[in-house]
Amino acid sequence: MRRYLVAASLLLLLTACGTADTPATPAASGGVTPIKLQLQWFFQAQFAGYIAAVDQGFYKEQGLDVQLLEGGVDIVPQTVLAQGKADYAVAWVPKALASREQGAGITDVGQIFARSGTYQVAWKDSGITTPADFKGKKVGNWGFGNEFELFAGMTKAGLDAGKDVTLVQQQFDMQALLKKEIDVAQAMSYNEYAQLLEATNPATGKLYTPGDFQIIDWKTNGSAMLQDAVWANTEKLNDPAYQQQTVKFLAATVKGWAYCRDNPEACRDLVVAKGSKLGKSHQLWQMNEINKLVWPATTAGVGMIDEAAWKQTVDISLTAKNQTGDTVLTKQPTGLAYTNDYIKQALDQVKAAGTDVTGTAFQPQTVTLTAGGA
């Protein structure tokens, strides 16, 4: 089996691209250690826990001065980390594993999202209810490593992505589905799906409702893969100072996510104030949906890597084929792909201070979206 093209290109990215003009700051200043965290997208509630940890002083309590580096379409967080231009990075597990196979020295030290938030969405009257129904249809996807679950679902349904469907490069919005240029579109539960519900149905003059759409949720058919995780520099993890710093960073991060679980409106406001391009109702929806992906956490606590979920992600990465027959990975990950050592120490620390790290009592909100997400 061959690699995905996106994975093959990552070796070049490791030596040719980056987003930060200055390296990760190596030394403490005045007793405070400066840290750069590379996010994988623009500021939005997907990263509210980190934003809150900065705003609420949780990182400062640990002696860390954390700078959040905004992501974007052309930014590969794990590459920025591997190049030494950030101290930590947030990235989806399969994307990062593909980078590791190409030589990136990175390790998952905190699995913040316990669940996948990826959907494929069709019109309710389309007759599309399962991945098998994609046959003969125009199937939208974003690419850039976001499509692995889609290919996993189609592979599991017995479809050949190169022959049985027409793959369409989708923009990071839902206009192609709304205009019926494609039959099924990729969406995140916390972002693009909300954009559909913020759009006006021209036939009624009212906003679309969930009843207008059919969701294919990869969590329900065994094709889900682990997503947002905190990645560290593997080589630096040999340094006791970086090990200690990682525990501190994770402890403050856990507190940030617990704060957003308990204060979703406040975290929504922090995200909007940070310069989010999307409005208040959209960001509250997103905060609520993100909380569903984080909470309840594993019984051991938020950030602990569940071995069964990790195995499923790796197995899919080895077997799901794209339109050219390539897979995400060609072999099992080697070396220190993940470790629970540092997150466990961080959890012990914040639990001792009274923070709820499992969120077993978490209940999602009911969020009312407005036109355009304003």
What label would you give each PLM region?
Residues 1-6:
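Bacterial N-terminal signal peptides that target proteins for export
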Residues 12-16:
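C-terminal motif of bacterial Sec signal peptides marking the signal peptidase cleavage site
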Residues 17-27:
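Bacterial lipoprotein signal-peptidase II cleavage site
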Residues 26-170, 174-179, 183-190, 216-218:
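Short, glycine-/small- and polar/acidic-enriched structural segments
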